[in-house]
């Protein structure tokens, strides 16, 4: 009985520490990752804007459902193993010649324990394309904030996205900060 109480006490203590540390962390964060691809900017652009085909190359996305537009913006629901997250396309400018393409998406559900935007910039390089993702994220729940910062990492989803895009084209990409 004594050991059970000690174990319970330690677990409660750890939980309290996680909540306290999470509460002390800032809600917002900025993270950036990039990768080079052999494909042209137009091919990369087509892949990252054709959200209905995400399940064919993004391992964590099992289905995509088009939702009604919101304030003139395209909205869709991405479903994965444990969740469904709606996204809103805030900005979409295709790359053209030497001009950089830009896509801005936003998590479109304020009830989730996290939110924010991704800005994807598509630029031509010698022999291919550079795709840079910048996340302006917010994590509202202190426990999730702790987990995001110290367990999962705030760049994991971006890195998975870039690696999956490379795999779609038969490339092994090198992730850059």
Specify the residue positions occupied by each region the protein language model found:
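Hydrophobic ligand-binding cavity/cleft-lining segments
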Residues: 4-68
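Short coil/turn motifs at beta-sheet boundaries
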Residues: 26-28, 80, 113, 126
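Intrinsic-disorder/low-complexity, polar/charged segments enriched in Ser/Thr/Lys/Arg/Asp/Glu/Gln
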Residues: 28-36, 84, 102, 117, ...
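Broad hydrophobic/π-residue packing in well-ordered secondary structure
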Residues: 45-47, 54-58, 74-78, 105, ...
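Short beta-edge strand/loop motif at the mouth of beta-sheet-based domains
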Residues: 52-102
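Beta-strand/loop substructures that line and gate deep hydrophobic ligand-binding cavities in soluble
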Residues: 88-91, 104-167, 171, 175-177
């Amino acid at each position: 009985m004594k050991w059970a109480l000690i174990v319970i006490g330690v677990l409660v203590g750890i939980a309290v520490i996680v909540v306290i540390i999470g509460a002390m962390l800032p809600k917002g964060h900025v993270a950036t990752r990039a990768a080079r691809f052999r494909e042209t900017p137009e091919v990369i652009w087509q892949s990252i804007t054709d959200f209905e085909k995400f399940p064919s190359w993004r391992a964590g996305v099992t289905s995509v459902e088009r939702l009604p537009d919101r304030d003139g913006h395209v909205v869709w629901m991405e479903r994965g193993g444990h969740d469904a997250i709606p996204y809103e396309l805030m900005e979409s400018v295709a790359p053209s010649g030497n001009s950089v393409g830009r896509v801005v998406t936003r998590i479109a559900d304020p009830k989730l324990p996290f939110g924010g935007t991704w800005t994807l910039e598509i630029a031509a390089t010698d022999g291919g394309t550079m795709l840079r993702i910048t996340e302006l994220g917010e994590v509202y729940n202190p426990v999730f904030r702790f987990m995001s910062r110290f367990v999962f990492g705030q760049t994991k989803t971006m890195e998975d996205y870039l690696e999956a895009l490379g795999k779609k084209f038969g490339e092994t990409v090198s992730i850059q900060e």
